[in-house]
Amino acid sequence: MPDENKQPLFQIQRVYLKGLSLEQPNSPAIFLEEQSPTLEVAVSTIAEQQADGIFESTVTVSVTAKIRDKVAFLVEAKQSGIFEIRHLPAEQLNPALGIGCPTILYPYLRANIADAITRAGFPPVHLSEINFQAFYLQQQKNKMATQPGQTAEEPAMALEQE
């Protein structure tokens, strides 16, 4: 069957927590602080082809909570997924990997981060929604401004939350 007759295919094969780390360098003293922490959140995405039509997409989020100048906790989590993507026009593949896949993975990542922070004894942190289309467009703009030969990992987006 010629390629032009094949229907585009986008399927989730698997969603998994690729990595999770939590540090509490100032526990237990930090629990006695009455001030609310300030949060710094950084987000990055990457997609890699694993086989013909099979891609791994990963969203990484780092959350650092500080009270005054002391770190209350630092969480880094990587949520990944295996996606089968076939017969997609070339101009649609990168947006599918940079927008579609992260949009699917991010809710799982948000839940895993909130759970880890709660299990560490802190109030849950509910990360804001991310518009991955705007994130992707910003990444493309940043790529155009950088020199060739840079890493395949997408630049991080930093968010501030109170």
From Swiss-Prot:
Signal peptide: none annotated. The keyword Mitochondrion does not apply. The keyword Ribonucleoprotein does not apply. Pfam families: SecB (PF02556). One of the proteins required for the normal export of preproteins out of the cell cytoplasm. It is a molecular chaperone that binds to a subset of precursor proteins, maintaining them in a translocation-competent state. It also specifically binds to its receptor SecA. One of its GO terms (molecular function) is unfolded protein binding. It is found in: Cytoplasm. InterPro entries: SecB, SecB-like_sf. Belongs to the SecB family. Homotetramer, a dimer of dimers. One homotetramer interacts with 1 SecA dimer. Keywords: Chaperone, Cytoplasm, Protein transport, Translocation, Transport. One of its GO terms (cellular component) is cytoplasm. This is Protein-export protein SecB 2. PANTHER family: PROTEIN-EXPORT PROTEIN SECB, PTHR36918. It comes from the Bacteria. One of its GO terms (biological process) is protein transport.
